[in-house]
């Protein structure tokens, strides 16, 4: 067990992304959204400070970073849009972060249809890291992240947390998340998946806990302290894992 935690700790220390600073280039200016749709256009950095959305068919290019401030909302999972972020995405405590939507006909599985246009699909890419800290809800569906996805803490309430149908070049790490449901499904992940201290309060009879289903994982899958209503709970099947399965996920 100690060896498992040592491996997980080494992975997290070696790959945890730093918070984004200023960046980008060109003549575009930065943009702060305090509510409503983010207009199509090119921006240096984007700061989300209120309940912000994207319109169906919008095309947004960000040459730097996106920051979702405390208690703010970035809903880019309800309407199909094209969003290109050159650097990092960071969501702060109490924020809502939803990126990506597609119909089942596009993904070949249950997918995450766009509420505004159920047959439409988004195209969202992040050139750096995606990091959340104490975020209320995270929904990542069919996006591309070049480096790492790190979900540190958070209380999701009744909204499920999903990491689904994504292409992630680095590691996926989720630690200290409290939610009704948490799933890592149908992803292509270049390096490791580390899941630890995820507590679910799913009251459905026979709730199986954290879902880890049909992922392609380039290195290792490491799990510990995954619970549903205080009882150990994890369900995994159909995964292609190039490395080892360790801890609570051994043998998945």
Predicted regions, residues:
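Short, low-complexity, Pro/Ser/Thr/Gly-rich segments in the mature regions of secreted, periplasmic
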Residues: 22-27, 238-252
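Short, ordered "entry" segments at domain starts
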Residues: 26-73, 77-82, 87, 110-111, ...
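Feature marks extracellular polysaccharide-active and adherence modules
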Residues: 49, 55, 63, 69, ...
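Acidic/polar low-complexity surface segments
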Residues: 94-122, 150-163, 183, 195-207, ...
